[in-house]
Amino acid sequence: MEGSDFLLAGVLFLFAAVAAVPLASRLGIGAVLGYLLAGIAIGPWGLGFISDVDEILHFSELGVVFLMFIIGLELNPSKLWQLRRSIFGVGAAQVLLSAALLAGLLMLTDFAWQAAVVGGIGLAMSSTAMALQLMRDKGMNRSESGQLGFSVLLFQDLAVIPALALVPLLAGSADEHFDWMKIGMKVLAFVGMLIGGRYLLRPVFRFIAASGVREVFTAATLLLVLGSALFMDALGLSMALGTFIAGVLLAESEYRHELETAIDPFKGLLLGLFFISVGMSLNLGVLYTHLLWVVIAVVVLVAVKILVLYLLARLYGVRSSERMQFAGVLSQGGEFAFVLFSTASSQRLFQGDQMALLLVTVTLSMMTTPLLMKLVDKWLSRQFNGPEEEDEKPWVNDDKPQVIVVGFGRFGQVIGRLLMANKMRITVLERDISAVNLMRKYGYKVYYGDATQVDLLRSAGAEAAESIVITCNEPEDTMKLVEICQQHFPHLHILARARGRVEAHELLQAGVTQFSRETFSSALELGRKTLVTLGMHPHQAQRAQLHFRRLDMRMLRELIPMHADTVQISRAREARRELEEIFQREMQQERRQLDGWDEFE
């Protein structure tokens, strides 16, 4: 592509995303399907604005690379070790069983057995980008099904290497003997990357962070991600696997959150580009010519994978309420099929339209997943949001809640228990299906689903409730829910959980004054106890805690106008100095009044 062509393609991609994704969200079909439809519209079989799909598809794989780096940051090595059984047990079983069944079905058609084996392996893989995105959207990350789904995807990435090595063997074009020297050099290079990353990455980032220039830190992060991807690609390994390992090596470092913040905007844009390019690759000519066969192939592919995944989830002991989520989110074909089938085609394993039919099947199966997950959500909603069983008697028999609690993790549970202990009528909205049944048994009125859906809020009694307590894990969900409540349920008193100062600023800007920073109060209480153990009078330590809380809140409010502004950095330093001066001055005054409590403070 020429430089001007790349610029034009970039403008078209941005326009397609800006136009299609909000429309898709408004129609309720999700952003991923919106990207895919946008790709079809601007691709060679749509309006024809872009014709060089293969080059863009290869570049857009960087979205998956960035996503795997962020996933790696969230998993430390000890956590990864805990997942070893699900990775090499369920993951291996899924690939082998799905590949065997699908290859057998392909052999019943016109596929030679070699082409059927390659086709079965390629179709057995799932889309890492789509599955992880949907798992995040559905709140499956921390659930049992989400952890198992990630394990399966990780094994599939590991299986890329032997799958690609198998193609020349099946084609009969492999060398009579392996180049063991070449293989040994690749293994040594991979081990060198692990050792070098383990001992060099943290000192390097410490040196870069000391410069205080944020742009350099972002550039270093991009260099790490792209460099590790390029290195693994040169070794003939998965680029996504390389960046995942780099993320794991930095998961326990002090720069984890800063790295995630630096990468996140690039990840989102490149993932969108990936889905658009997948949509562009859909060959509508093959679809029109072989419509019936393609529809049958998509249905069979999704059905076989759901069957295998559901049975494995049952054998693994996954709760019945989570099995369909696990099976549905991994039921599509994946991006690896494009690479494997292209390699097989270059070795002349496929005949006629076989490769085109397989690729169309994979692409359409990816488009079915968001719709399938919506059907699963509706089924789960009917299953768990229906009338409660007679033996599950709630503490309060009033259908109109006083309070709606959104999210019932560790933070929300404390609030819920306090309210229930004081005979308040509460309704809980929770996206983790595994927790819904358990909470109902203990008398909570629980609705499964996404609280950012207005219909679910109405069903939960938002129009009659007095307050809503938002304890979402994701700040984006919190702010979206605040906006919805202010627009549709303005009578509600909004109380929210803030993960830190940034979220606190956003809540204040949105007009939410009743919020709690999740670690602030507990840290202050522990600090007060520390002062007492150091010899400070208990009254003086209590007053010190109150002063610090008041002054910190004042500083928080003063910094609102400069939120997300570079000036905030210098102002924050100035505010800290001011806080210290005021704190010392007021504490000197307190030392003269060690007796008595100021009830008006």
From Swiss-Prot:
Domain RCK N-terminal per the UniProt entry, residue ranges: 400-519
Record Pfam families: Na_H_Exchanger (PF00999), TrkA_N (PF02254)
Classification via PROSITE patterns: RCK_N
Annotated disulfide bonds: none
Gene Ontology BP annotations: proton transmembrane transport
Compartment(s): Cell inner membrane
GO terms assigned for molecular function: glutathione-regulated potassium exporter activity
Topology in the lipid bilayer: Multi-pass membrane protein
Keyword DNA-binding attributed: no
Gene Ontology annotations for the cellular component aspect, listed alphabetically: plasma membrane
Ranges that cross the membrane: 4-24, 29-49, 55-75, 87-107, 115-135, 152-172, 177-197, 207-227, 230-250, 268-288, 291-311, 324-344, 356-376
SUPFAM superfamilies per UniProt: NAD(P)-binding Rossmann-fold domains (SSF51735)
Keyword terms: Antiport, Cell inner membrane, Cell membrane, Ion transport, Membrane, Potassium, Potassium transport, Transmembrane, Transmembrane helix, Transport
NCBIfam families attached to this UniProt entry: 2a37, PRK03659.1
Protein function: Pore-forming subunit of a potassium efflux system that confers protection against electrophiles. Catalyzes K(+)/H(+) antiport.
Similarity comment: family membership: Belongs to the monovalent cation:proton antiporter 2 (CPA2) transporter (TC 2.A.37) family. KefB subfamily.
Subunit structure: Interacts with the regulatory subunit KefG.
Protein name: Glutathione-regulated potassium-efflux system protein KefB
Source organism of the structure: Escherichia coli O17:K52:H18 (strain UMN026 / ExPEC)
Gene symbol of the encoding locus: kefB
